[in-house]
């Protein structure tokens, strides 16, 4: 059973000198249920080596571990699954490669895309950006934020779990879950925090308040 409450996406460029595995280790002690290895600016070798460390940490803590985009890397480090975007292989192809037990996620921003991904066999969705975010260069603007109304519409449209992502903080996570999300996915809120464990705990509490 996957714990969707707080989902951490890694991004070392925001970590202010701390290692990603240090941040992840602290965060999973305080309520993070899913970790996604992202690190788009790292080489394949660097991601592989980091992924091995994160796989060990997450396995010991019984935390779900997925890899962004790279199905081959997910296989190489024995991740639980993969998270796919618009430019990645289709969900059905990932399923054929990784098998029925793999956890396969899909990023979506519209009701139509959410329905399509669910029909294709995605296990969960990442919906957003819910709010404006600075962690992705192309969506650092309010016009790209889908808002909690879109979250509510997607909750009505699909029966698979989904997390809201994009600009999520402990201050707005409750509203995202109240709108119908099963949890929240974050990069900055935990990665840039002085105390990642406390940040994860605050997010977990906010999610619980939204139920």
From Swiss-Prot:
Instruction: Read off the InterPro entries from this record.
Output: Aldolase_TIM, ThiamineP_synth_sf, ThiamineP_synth_TenI, TMP_synthase
> Which reaction is recorded as catalysed by this protein?
2-[(2R,5Z)-2-carboxy-4-methylthiazol-5(2H)-ylidene]ethyl phosphate + 4-amino-2-methyl-5-(diphosphooxymethyl)pyrimidine + 2 H(+) = thiamine phosphate + CO2 + diphosphate; 2-(2-carboxy-4-methylthiazol-5-yl)ethyl phosphate + 4-amino-2-methyl-5-(diphosphooxymethyl)pyrimidine + 2 H(+) = thiamine phosphate + CO2 + diphosphate; 4-methyl-5-(2-phosphooxyethyl)-thiazole + 4-amino-2-methyl-5-(diphosphooxymethyl)pyrimidine + H(+) = thiamine phosphate + diphosphate
Pathway(s) per entry: Cofactor biosynthesis; thiamine diphosphate biosynthesis; thiamine phosphate from 4-amino-2-methyl-5-diphosphomethylpyrimidine and 4-methyl-5-(2-phosphoethyl)-thiazole: step 1/1
Please indicate if the UniProt record lists Chloroplast as a keyword.
no
Binding site residues for Mg(2+):
69, 88
Keywords for this protein: Magnesium, Metal-binding, Thiamine biosynthesis, Transferase
Q: How is the cofactor bound?
A: Binds 1 Mg(2+) ion per subunit.
Q: Which domain of life is it from?
A: Archaea
Q: Which GO terms describe its biological process?
A: thiamine biosynthetic process; thiamine diphosphate biosynthetic process
* Leading EC class: transferase
Name the cofactor(s): Mg(2+)
Which Pfam families did the record assign? TMP-TENI
Family designation: Belongs to the thiamine-phosphate synthase family.
Protein's recorded name: Thiamine-phosphate synthase
């Amino acid at each position: 059973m996957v714990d969707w409450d707080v989902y951490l996406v890694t991004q070392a460029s925001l970590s202010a000198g701390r290692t990603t595995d240090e941040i992840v280790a602290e965060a999973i002690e305080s309520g993070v249920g899913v970790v996604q290895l992202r690190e788009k600016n790292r080489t394949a070798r660097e991601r592989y080596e980091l992924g091995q460390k994160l796989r060990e940490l997450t396995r010991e803590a019984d935390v779900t571990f997925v890899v962004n985009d790279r199905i081959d890397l997910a296989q190489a480090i024995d991740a639980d699954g993969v998270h796919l975007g618009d430019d990645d292989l289709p969900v059905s192809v990932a399923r054929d490669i990784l098998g029925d037990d793999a956890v396969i996620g899909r990023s979506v921003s519209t009701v139509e895309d959410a329905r399509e991904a669910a029909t294709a066999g995605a296990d969960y969705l990442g919906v957003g950006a819910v709010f404006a975010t600075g962690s992705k260069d192309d969506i650092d603007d309010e016009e790209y934020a889908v808002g909690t109304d879109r979250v509510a519409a997607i909750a009505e449209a699909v029966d698979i779990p989904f997390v809201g992502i994009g600009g999520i903080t402990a201050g707005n996570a409750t509203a995202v879950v109240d709108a119908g999300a099963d949890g929240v996915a974050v990069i900055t809120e935990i990665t840039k925090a002085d105390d990642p464990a406390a940040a994860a705990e605050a997010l977990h509490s906010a999610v619980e308040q939204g139920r």
